[in-house]
Amino acid sequence: MTIKVHGNPRSTATQRVLVALYEKHLEFEFVPIDMGAGGHKQPSYLALNPFGQVPALEDGEIKLFESRAITKYLAYTHDHQNEGTSLIHKEKHEMAAQLVWEEVEAHQFDPVASKLAWELVFKGIFGMQTDTTVVEENEAKLAKVLDVYEARLTESEYLGANDSFTLVDLHHLPLLGYLMGTQVKKLFEERAHVSAWCKKILARPSWEKTLALQKQA
């Protein structure tokens, strides 16, 4: 049965799931949700995600929401040799590193990066004024996070594992994609290993396909 993804291609959370599907080489049907028209608050959608947020995924009788839960589900249920990039590690030392850095992305990087993306990207789309104080505060916070990333990436090619792209890196892609088009780009470029890592993961075909779907919307 075909996997169905309900979401908005401009949503960072939806993009996270799309990248995972493309990395796993899985066929899926994309069901666009018109959030401007309140599609995410309709009863039919709330049956999939009671919080009225995108995305939601249907895999036969299984229904999921929360983007990181969905990417983990896809990675663990489709971890076979012919199903694209593994995205996870099962050896305990590598698994430990991956689990730690997944939490770092969710609790250290994402809150700060999301505020910056809102101020520097999405507010402009909605005709709202950027709060420069919020931008300055969060640029300083992001710089500290990226200092930790720089140290990590001096000893590891990727954040979650030494030599392989995992969910850790994947989860960063949507916000990186937006922030690299703003003044915040300099914070990434000032750190050599962080800059190289960004260029590497943003060049992945899965991300290019995700952007292509966004342009079609």
Swiss-Prot record:
The GST N-terminal domain sits at 2-82
Its name, as the record gives it, is Glutathione S-transferase
**Where found?**
Cytoplasm
Question: Where does the GST C-terminal domain lie?
Answer: 91-217
**Xref: InterPro entries:** Glutathione-S-Trfase_C-like, Glutathione-S-Trfase_C_sf, Glutathione_S-Trfase, Glutathione_S-Trfase_N, GST_C, GST_Phi_C, Thioredoxin-like_sf
The UniProt keyword set, sorted, is: Cytoplasm, Transferase
CDD domains on file = GST_C_Phi, GST_N_Phi
Keyword Transferase present in the record's keywords: the answer is yes
State the family named in the UniProt similarity comment for this chain: Belongs to the GST superfamily. Phi family.
Which amino acids does the record list as binding glutathione? 11, 40-41, 53-54, 66-67
Protein role: Conjugation of reduced glutathione to a wide number of exogenous and endogenous hydrophobic electrophiles.
Lineage per the UniProt record? Eukaryota, Viridiplantae, Streptophyta, Embryophyta, Tracheophyta
Top-rank EC class of the record's enzyme: transferase
GO biological process per UniProt: glutathione metabolic process; toxin catabolic process
Q: From the UniProt record, which GO molecular function terms apply? A: glutathione binding; glutathione transferase activity
